[in-house]
Amino acid sequence: MKLTCMMIVAVLFLTAWTFVTAVPHSSNVLENLYLKARHEMENQEASKLNMRDDDCEPPGNFCGFPKIGGPCCSGWCFFACA
């Protein structure tokens, strides 16, 4: 019973702490993201999604240290592009 009460108090404390430390203007952040997305829909030349990266390495070329992302067109690098 004591453990249950302690867990309830801990959850309530953490919930209150989350609300106290939350960003006060977080709704403006979401609004700005919405406006940016809307602008990119209206002006497709401004969209980063339509840009193609022609500087990437084709499969089989050396890319360096194993990583995700990197210079490979596929995004997978394990010493050679996948």
Swiss-Prot record:
Record carries keyword Methyltransferase: no
One Pfam family linked to the record: Conotoxin
Tissue specificity annotation: Expressed by the venom duct.
GO MF annotation, one: toxin activity
Annotated propeptide span(s): 23-52
Compartments, record wording: Secreted
Signal sequence, renumbered to the chain: 1-22
Matching InterPro entries: Conotoxin, Conotoxin_omega-typ_CS
Post-translational modifications reported in the UniProt record: Mostly non-hydroxylated.
Record-annotated disulphide pairs: 56-73, 63-77, 72-81
Primary residence: secreted
Record's GO cellular component terms: extracellular region
Record key words, sorted: Bromination, Calcium channel impairing toxin, Disulfide bond, Ion channel impairing toxin, Knottin, Secreted, Signal, Toxin
UniProt modified residues of type 6'-bromotryptophan: 76
Family per similarity comment: Belongs to the conotoxin O1 family.
Function: Omega-conotoxins act at presynaptic membranes, they bind and block voltage-gated calcium channels (Cav).
Domain notes per entry: The cysteine framework is VI/VII (C-C-CC-C-C).
Protein name in the entry: Omega-conotoxin-like Am6.2
Organism in which the protein naturally occurs: Conus amadis
